[in-house]
Amino acid sequence: MRDETPEQPAPLRFGYTTGSCATATSLAAARLLLAGSADDAVEIVLPKGQRVMMRLEFCRATADGAEAATIKDAGDDPDVTHGALIFARVALASAPGVRFHAGPGVGTVTRAGLTLPVGEPAINPVPRQMMTTHLEALAAEHGYAGGFDVTIGVEGGEALALKTMNPRLGIVGGLSILGTTGIVRPFSCSAYIASIHQGIDVARANGIAHIAACTGNASEDAMRAHYQLPDMALIEMGDFAGAVLKHLRRAPVARLSMCGGFGKLSKLAAGHLDLHSRHSSIDLPLLAQWAAEAGASDALQAAMRAANTSQEALKLAHADGVPLGDLVCAQALRVARDIVPPSVAVEIFAIDRQGRFVGEAR
């Protein structure tokens, strides 16, 4: 779960997805079986055509096939799997085709609404296609007409998965093998955004019409207490308000409650869809302007512009009888309604650092 106000410096280095790691290790293991060569690095082709060389920790024969492993390097992205050992075990099969299995640390889908059927290992479609493409090319190169059984695992993956949204999404037993481009872009947080989308899809597929998108622990607790919503209806959006709102264009629900800290929602109110301080900042003069439109005195406006934090500006406004929390929520509601379909009923709630409601709009 994300804190309400995470701060990180902006990094630069790219990394590779778990899907790329699975592709490299499965290819290396299969090559050992078909060509007899155990490599210490393997080249793979990413979905957009880039060729990359990935270093292996080991590549060795087993009693029933071969296995290879690599260390996941997410670059400078804050990825929960960074530094994890990802491995593939490959066995040859008489039937053609590639069959995927969840090894230790890789989850299994147990709920409808995801891109994979219930009962399938949580190896997403693009990584599956990457592995299939590489293994079929290897088979053709060596004149092999049989198939492959591929088991993907992540060392410690079951524990790491508890730090992700997988348990709430109904992916049990471990992590998902992810990636659409094969590359992890620094602080793109693509896996986190994908899990937001999956959370909405799972809620819809299981008949939930009212979801609550929350920026962190305190806002989620507030929504859970206010509406007695099931966990499946609670979407951990973190700073990615835009990921929620834009996905609802394609996958609408009947009702959206959005809840967050007052400062973060003031950024949404100003039109920012990424609420992290790297990408947006709190606009105290704009808060003062909204207060002025509600009758704030010149003295209050000046004090708000000079405030050290949004919370200080909020306290000043409330002490003077100006409902700044409601004003900010109303502006955030306007931004949200401009994005989601008219069929989605939207409401916005702001909380203070103690988790108390300080504003709302419908």
Curated annotation (Swiss-Prot):
It catalyses: Co-precorrin-5B + S-adenosyl-L-methionine = Co-precorrin-6A + S-adenosyl-L-homocysteine. InterPro entries: CbiD, CbiD_sf. It comes from the Bacteria. Its EC number is 2.1.1.195. GO terms for biological process: anaerobic cobalamin biosynthetic process; methylation. Keywords: Cobalamin biosynthesis, Methyltransferase, S-adenosyl-L-methionine, Transferase. GO terms for molecular function: cobalt-precorrin-5B C1-methyltransferase activity. Pathway: Cofactor biosynthesis; adenosylcobalamin biosynthesis; cob(II)yrinate a,c-diamide from sirohydrochlorin (anaerobic route): step 6/10. Belongs to the CbiD family. This is Cobalt-precorrin-5B C(1)-methyltransferase. It comes from Burkholderia lata (strain ATCC 17760 / DSM 23089 / LMG 22485 / NCIMB 9086 / R18194 / 383).
